[in-house]
Amino acid sequence: MLIPRKVKHRKQHHPGRTGHATGGTVVSFGEYGIQALTPAYVTNRQIESARIAMTRHVKRGGNVYINIFPDRPLTKKPAETRMGSGKGSVEWWVANVKPGRVLFELSGVDEATAREALTRAIHKLPLKARIIKREEGDA
């Protein structure tokens, strides 16, 4: 699971999900990628589930690149607890994904295999996404 090794503050305010991604919007490491179309919090378990779905489909053929990291803690209070008495304990680590952000990249496989693997990964994620191909001029 992806979680930060060490954080300065254990609990944070919830980040806003408005606006579009400013960086990480092009495929830079692989040949194909998953680009978010809607904003969402993606948990570390969802990232791991999508990664496993891709790697199992491509077997030993390709390389999978993860471009997001769950660096935000989300807290939750226990069930049937009275209001007050502080903020709840950390339950999940999430990545704040905005539209336009490339989440995963894939290289080393043919286009049909890549599209199927990325489609399987999209089904594991809590957002709408599309598959994009690397442009010639991209870094």
Curated annotation (Swiss-Prot):
Pfam families: Ribosomal_L16 (PF00252). InterPro entries: Ribosomal_uL16 (IPR047873), Ribosomal_uL16_bact-type (IPR000114), Ribosomal_uL16_CS (IPR020798), Ribosomal_uL16_dom (IPR016180), Ribosomal_uL16_sf (IPR036920). It comes from the Bacteria. GO terms for cellular component: cytosolic large ribosomal subunit. Keywords: Ribonucleoprotein, Ribosomal protein, RNA-binding, rRNA-binding, tRNA-binding. One of its GO terms (biological process) is translation. CDD domains: Ribosomal_L16_L10e. SUPFAM superfamilies: Ribosomal protein L16p/L10e (SSF54686). Residues 1-24 are annotated as: Disordered. GO terms for molecular function: rRNA binding; structural constituent of ribosome; tRNA binding. Residues 1-17 have a biased composition (Basic residues). NCBIfam families: rplP_bact. Belongs to the universal ribosomal protein uL16 family. Binds 23S rRNA and is also seen to make contacts with the A and possibly P site tRNAs. This is Large ribosomal subunit protein uL16. It comes from Clavibacter michiganensis subsp. michiganensis (strain NCPPB 382).
